[in-house]
Curated annotation (Swiss-Prot):
SS bond list: none
Gene that encodes the chain: galK
Binding of substrate, residues: E37, H38, T39, D40, Y228
The protein's name in its UniProt record: Galactokinase
Stored NCBIfam families: gal_kin, PRK05322.1
Keyword Repressor: no
One cellular-component annotation, GO: cytosol
């Protein structure tokens, strides 16, 4: 599933499915978050990178008002046809709800999409892995529409439309990190993003003799059906309770002193744990960015470890599979740090590993994980990529 495609292959595949030559081909990356988990909807900082696993697209404008979607990942669904005038969420339309949502909100924003198009998609992000296949597809759709219809579309506006699609069309109360990382990514750079202001820095990702290993639990996770929305609601309630004494809008405005000082205002122990994670994770992200800028990878790794402990015990979004991967990774030679990445509840973890120990690392972690969980994990080396773009 990690096959990379060329523009030429995409053209051939498009022709085989739709019987027409393609207009243009595209690539949209996935993302991992180095640190700063569940902070994006809490007004905190995040530190993601776009990666070379992602979503490929090929498209051709039509002369009528019909959208035709085909995914090589869901061949059994065949070509799904949708009238351009009827862009509403329909469960049976499966993956096409993501592009439908983006097109709906582009039109709502005043962008003229006056014809249908044929849209071929292939993703090599493992499904349900938490590497943002949905956001990758959302930003891909926007860039396809931008080029087919010559839209005057600022990339940040498209990022916001991707989030709007996730929140108001699909029904997941996610933050803006995934779409931002995918839309604004740059080669060999991490994005240090303040989700409260959307101010960001592109930070050189110099890992020296280390690589980021992505560890996939291979346990499916459906974000919309998980406890993700529940965690967000708990944090929003904690903010309401703190507003009795504090002039704040988000947990990201607090430091660790404040969350301790005013903890008595939060009436539920679980909500206090959620709030503590959001505040301290934001502080860890500030420190991690400074450590990376200074070339201090040992400190960066320790902050990764502390992040996972907080996600495990305070935010409670890890579970057996992620904890087994991360705890086993911590015990291996050559590992500077490891943590879950993404929303949690399965999906993936990452580890910062010395290059010359990677093979031994994969063997040891994979063996122990299979003994505990009953099936094998998958491993990928995270290659940092640029944002969504035209291939040819």
């Amino acid at each position: 599933m990690t096959q990379h495609l060329t523009a030429e292959t995409l053209r051939k595949d498009f022709l085989a499915v739709f019987g027409q030559e393609v207009d243009q081909t595209f690539f949209s990356p996935g993302r991992i978050n180095l640190i700063g988990e569940h902070t994006d909807y809490n007004g905190g900082h995040v530190f993601p990178v776009a990666i070379s696993l992602g979503t490929y697209g090929a498209a051709r404008k039509r002369d009528d008002q019909v959208l035709r979607f085909y995914s090589a990942n869901f061949e059994d669904k065949g070509i799904i046809e949708v009238p351009l005038a009827d862009l509403k969420f329909e469960k049976e339309h499966n993956w096409t709800n993501y592009p439908k949502g983006v097109l709906h909100f582009l039109q709502e924003a005043g962008h003229v999409i006056d014809k249908g198009f044929d849209f071929y998609v292939y993703g090599n992000i493992p499904n349900g892995s938490g590497l943002s296949s949905s956001a990758s597809l959302e930003i891909l759709t926007g860039v396809v529409a931008e080029h087919l219809f010559d839209l005057k579309l600022e990339r940040l506006d498209l990022v916001k439309i991707g989030k709007q699609t996730e929140n108001n069309f699909i029904g997941v109360n996610s933050g803006i990190m995934d779409q931002f990382a995918i839309g604004m990514g740059a080669d060999q750079r991490a994005i240090y993003l303040d989700t409260n202001t959307l101010e960001y820095d592109l930070v050189p990702l110099d890992l020296k003799d280390n690589v980021v290993v992505i560890m996939n639990t291979n346990k499916r996770r459906e974000l919309a059906d998980s406890k993700y929305n529940e965690r967000r609601a708990e944090c929003e309630k904690a903010v309401e309770e703190l507003q009795v004494a504090l002039d704040i809008q988000t947990l990201g405005e607090l430091d660790e002193w404040a969350v301790d000082q005013y903890s008595y205002l939060i009436k539920d122990e679980n909500r206090l744990k959620r709030a503590r994670h959001a505040v301290l994770e934001n502080q860890r992200t500030l420190k991690a960015q400074a450590a990376l800028q200074a070339g201090d990878l040992e400190t960066f790794g320790r902050l990764m470890n502390a992040s996972h402990v907080s996600l495990e015990h305070d935010y409670e979004v890890t579970g057996l599979e992620l904890d087994t991967l991360v705890h086993t990774a911590w015990a291996q030679e050559g590992v500077l740090g490891a943590r879950m990445t993404g929303a949690g509840f399965s999906g993936c973890a990452i580890a910062l590993v010395q290059k010359d120990t990677v093979e031994a690392f994969k063997e040891a972690v994979g063996k122990h994980y299979e003994e505990v969980v009953g099936y094998a994990p998958s491993f990928y080396i995270a290659e940092v990529a640029g944002g969504t773009r035209v291939l040819d």
